[in-house]
């Protein structure tokens, strides 16, 4: 009997210590004050694909339309399927401009028309009682030249286009070069004016913490790599008043903010590769 009681107590002690350990490992989410939060469709997961650029750029286009009162939900699966069937496509990786090029080439369909890449591609797209070909539908949600890609580098002249030498830029797309401070102010103004924005940058830094849902510049290396794309859907401030962009990611919803992430202005200044936003917002 004594052995049984001791064993039972040991079990209870084990469960208690396990609970305390898990509690100590859990992180209390940081508190942010939301200044601007633009509309967006549900956060998705890109799974094992390299299509973050497609998720992010389509999310920016969706936000642009949602804030204009349109109900738009777009299919990444369509783009994935069309690329897989195109022998000229060199890589599944890409940049925001890659998505714009792809829908210009293949067209686009609504999310409900094709949710998975192995679904049968529809011949037509239907929205608000109208029937479109995929090319017509793509043009209706994103006209050619509607978006521009901005970058910032000291190695090229400002206020001019340059071709970034990046593995993901296998199409040799160009970015319009602006000073870093201008890139930040243009992006912030776009979000405040309720426009959709796609961000591309370095997420390999220790300061980028997906599990906590926060990216800060406190721990940053000197080099910048082109790792990931996200949509910018809002603006916020932390408890100390530091400004942040609210990012819509494509890694599912298992973080403290249901798939959103708060990225500091300091991180943006030092780790941005490109930003894609409506061309009308940029004076050239």
PLM regions and their residue ranges:
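Sec-dependent signal peptide recognition
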Residues: 11-16
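C-terminal motif of bacterial Sec signal peptides marking the signal peptidase cleavage site
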Residues: 23-24
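N-terminal regions that are enriched for targeting/export leaders
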Residues: 28-38
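Active-site nucleophilic cysteine motif
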Residues: 47-62, 89-101, 228
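Structural recognition of the beta-strand scaffold that forms the well-ordered cores
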Residues: 51-54, 77-82, 99-102, 110-112, ...
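Papain-like cysteine protease catalytic cores
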Residues: 72-139
């Amino acid at each position: 009997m004594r052995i049984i009681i001791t064993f039972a107590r040991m079990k209870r002690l084990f469960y208690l210590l396990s609970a305390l350990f898990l509690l100590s490992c859990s992180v209390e989410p940081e508190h942010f004050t939301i200044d601007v939060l633009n509309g967006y469709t549900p956060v998705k997961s890109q799974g094992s694909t390299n299509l973050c650029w497609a998720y992010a750029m389509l999310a920016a286009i969706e936000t642009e339309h949602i804030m204009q009162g349109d109900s738009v939900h777009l299919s990444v699966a369509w783009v994935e399927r069309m690329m897989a069937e195109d022998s000229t496509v060199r890589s599944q990786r890409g940049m925001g401009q890659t998505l714009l090029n792809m829908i210009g080439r293949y067209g686009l369909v609504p999310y409900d028309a094709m949710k998975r890449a192995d679904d049968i591609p529809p011949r037509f797209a239907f929205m608000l009682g109208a029937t479109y070909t995929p090319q017509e539908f793509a043009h209706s949600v994103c006209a050619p030249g509607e978006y521009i890609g901005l970058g910032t580098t000291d190695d090229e002249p400002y206020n001019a286009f340059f071709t970034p030498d990046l593995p993901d830029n296998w199409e040799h797309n160009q970015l319009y070069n602006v000073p870093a401070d201008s890139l930040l102010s243009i992006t912030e103004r776009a979000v405040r004016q309720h426009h959709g924005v796609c961000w591309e940058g370095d997420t390999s830094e220790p300061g980028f913490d997906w599990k906590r849902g926060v990216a800060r510049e406190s721990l940053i290396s000197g080099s910048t790599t082109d790792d990931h794309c996200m949509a910018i859907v809002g603006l916020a401030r932390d408890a100390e008043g530091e400004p942040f962009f609210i990012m819509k990611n494509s890694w599912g919803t298992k973080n403290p903010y249901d798939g959103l992430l708060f990225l500091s202005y300091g991180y943006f200044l030092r780790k941005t590769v490109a930003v894609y936003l409506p061309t009308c917002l940029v004076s050239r």
